[in-house]
Amino acid sequence: MDIRKESLKKHYEWNGKIEVVSRVPINSAEDLSLAYTPGVAEPCLEIQKDYDKSFELTRRNNLVAVVTDGTAVLGLGDIGPEAGMPVMEGKCALFKEFGDVDAFPICVRSKDVEEIVNAIYLISGSFGGINLEDIAAPRCFEIEKKLKEKCDIPIFHDDQHGTAVIVAAGLINSLKLVHKNLDEIKVVMNGAGAAGIAIAKHLLNMGVKDITLCDSKGIICKGDPRLNAVKQEMAEITNLSHLEGSLTDAMKGADVFLGISAAGCVSEEMVKSMAKDPILFAMANPTPEIMPDIAKKAGAAVVGTGRSDFPNQINNVLAFPGIFRGALDCRASDINEEMKVAASFAIASLVSDEELNADYILPEAFDKRIGKTVAEAVKKAAIESGVARI
């Protein structure tokens, strides 16, 4: 089957992947007067007295906006907000299927940070959370930061943090197989965009001490005048050995390679130069940084990719539905680092020691335990870290 052609055919048939369904019966004049006028005036007046009542008297408690400007859609790049709509609808369908979260696509016709921030802020009173999606770096960092400062509901850029949570979960289990610890490993990352930077920060928060970050020009190091502000910040907290040079140089002696970059940029020789039993997550799509068979031939102990046709798919769908479910259930004001760390360990825990092997480091996407397990861990972390409001 040609997936691309079949998907296009199905999208014409579906004419959209989501719809609004009424939660209340409206079959009589009495039903109408309760759900709408005149009865609806009473909940309106209650909310006027206390805006937080909107979480109890409306569906706001379960609503998430999936927002994009269409500038970094999948591997397609800057295709515009309307062209990004099929992805946003798909994301909303996944929210419902895997987390029972009601999500709506919001595609914004602007590339201006202040316009986007203002647009999202102005509608934030209708939602319990905001999921930012497919917004190009470095603008995505600024948008997320400004929204977190302005809004009192969770702001979560899934391309950054969802990816980071899954990578960490996969790494936790991979390290069990090779008998190494987070605080002992040397990690090399290729790709310093939204996902790469978020992964690096998340791993540092989880106890990894030695991370070297590379971009298309080579190793990111302090004092490099070409770096933008975000990369300068990363240079301060990574590459503590002050390495210089190329990705090839960085990978020598590394325990872990994480790629969020370009197809075919890692060779068999580069894998052979790594430490014993290296772990490689080659997540470039559709063609990974190195094909799994080549990596394993070169000595890789564990290989993950972003693809579903290889073992160990690094797939955000394991994370974002449960993360938002947990955040919404306790009306969290933020999705903080403690909650993301909890999500990583929760996902990793769903693969038992008996099941764990080099081709099975993460649970399957359709494992019914995932959403509930992640949600419970995230909710607990929110309560313990003080961002839960109920």
Stretches with model-predicted labels:
Residues 74, 79-99, 157, 161, ...:
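Glycine-rich phosphate/diphosphate-binding loop of Rossmann-like nucleotide-binding domains
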Residues 158-159, 282-390:
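Adenosine-phosphate binding glycine-rich loop
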Residues 150-166, 280-285:
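Short, acidic/small-residue loops that bind anionic groups at enzyme active sites
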Residues 232-301, 307-309:
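Rossmann-like adenosine-cofactor binding region
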Residues 1-155, 381, 385-389:
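N-terminal ligand-binding/catalytic initiation module
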Residues 12, 55-60, 96-97, 122-124, ...:
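Solvent-exposed alpha-helices and their adjacent loops that cap or buttress functional pockets
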Residues 105, 131-134, 155-158, 189, ...:
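General beta-strand structural signal in soluble alpha/beta enzymes
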